[in-house]
Amino acid sequence: MTENEKVTRNVQGRVVSNKADKTITVLVERRVRHPLYGKYIRRSSKMQAHDEGNECQVGDVVTIEQCRPISKSKAWRLVKVLERAAQ
């Protein structure tokens, strides 16, 4: 039999808030094609992620991955900071 490996979903986004303790809000943008007209449209989602070390600042570009639910609104955790915001 094959081993049961979890496939985690990773996304990249920009931190828009870090006001809560150990929590960041990440804005994830994606491009989708309009079904009738074919034009590409930007769609965005705000996700709350767990930041154990409070290391992120507003404007950072980060990678987050899906995990077990940590609270009512958090089911993502910070993997790494890709790019720091200009201070």
Curated annotation (Swiss-Prot):
Instruction: Give the range the annotation lists for the signal sequence.
Output: none
Q: Which UniProt keywords apply?
A: Ribonucleoprotein, Ribosomal protein, RNA-binding, rRNA-binding
GO molecular function terms noted in the UniProt entry: rRNA binding; structural constituent of ribosome
**Classification via InterPro entries:** NA-bd_OB-fold, Ribosomal_uS17, Ribosomal_uS17_bact/chlr, Ribosomal_uS17_CS
**Could you name the Gene Ontology cellular component terms for this entry?**
cytosolic small ribosomal subunit
User: What PROSITE patterns is this protein classified in?
Assistant: RIBOSOMAL_S17 (PS00056)
Name the Gene Ontology biological process terms. translation
Quaternary assembly: Part of the 30S ribosomal subunit.
Give the family from UniProt.
Belongs to the universal ribosomal protein uS17 family.
Q: What does this protein do?
A: One of the primary rRNA binding proteins, it binds specifically to the 5'-end of 16S ribosomal RNA.
- Protein name in the entry: Small ribosomal subunit protein uS17
- Origin species, per record, is Alkalilimnicola ehrlichii (strain ATCC BAA-1101 / DSM 17681 / MLHE-1)
